[in-house]
């Protein structure tokens, strides 16, 4: 399943980059995130809890940054499993940040997600709707947190 989009924010590119890559940012912006810990400079482990269809799923995952071109490009690979054996997932995400007019940045993202097990039985339509909803919440949270950070 491929999910992609882009949005703009009024923020300096370097501060946006630093903010996006801070583990504390991710845990505060991802809906349902219960934990996010840095394993090393390029790897995070986390737990996210989400309601999908009729069930609530808790996911353990590891995210590793595989390409870094500060402050414009990052590629990350993720691997996770649902607590209780409801399935596994893999994910590859690319985020590109570029400066545009008026002190704004454009953040473009593309993510390929593969689901196996009970997670996959919900079907792409249900999963895509859920992922899009979470993505929208993440973007709003990110914009709010970055505005708050810039105001300090």
Where are these regions (language model features)?
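Hydrophobic ligand-binding cavity/cleft-lining segments
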Residues: 1-51, 152
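Intrinsic-disorder/low-complexity, polar/charged segments enriched in Ser/Thr/Lys/Arg/Asp/Glu/Gln
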Residues: 2-8, 43, 60, 73, ...
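Hydrophobic/aromatic beta-strand elements that line small-molecule binding cavities or substrate pockets
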Residues: 5, 34, 60-67, 78, ...
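Short strand-connecting beta-turns/loops that link adjacent beta-strands
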Residues: 12, 41, 70, 100-103
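Hydrophobic pocket/interface hotspot
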Residues: 16, 20, 26, 65, ...
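Glycine-rich portal/gate segments that line the openings of hydrophobic small-molecule binding cavities
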Residues: 37-81, 137
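Beta-strand/loop substructures that line and gate deep hydrophobic ligand-binding cavities in soluble
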Residues: 80-129
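A conserved amphipathic terminal alpha-helix motif
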Residues: 118-152
């Amino acid at each position: 399943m491929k999910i992609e989009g882009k949005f703009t924010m009024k923020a300096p590119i370097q501060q946006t980059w630093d903010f996006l890559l801070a583990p504390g940012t991710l845990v505060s912006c991802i809906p349902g995130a219960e934990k996010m810990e840095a394993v090393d400079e390029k790897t995070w482990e986390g737990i996210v809890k989400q309601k999908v269809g009729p069930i609530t799923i808790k996911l353990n995952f590891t995210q590793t940054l595989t390409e870094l071109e500060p402050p414009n490009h990052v590629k990350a690979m993720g691997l996770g499993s649902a607590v209780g054996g409801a399935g596994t997932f893999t994910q590859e995400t690319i985020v590109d940040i570029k400066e545009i007019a008026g002190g704004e940045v454009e953040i473009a993202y593309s993510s390929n997600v593969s689901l196996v097990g009970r997670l996959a039985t919900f079907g792409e339509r249900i999963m895509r709707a859920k992922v899009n909803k979470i993505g929208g919440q993440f973007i709003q949270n990110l914009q709010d947190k970055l505005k708050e950070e810039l105001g300090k």
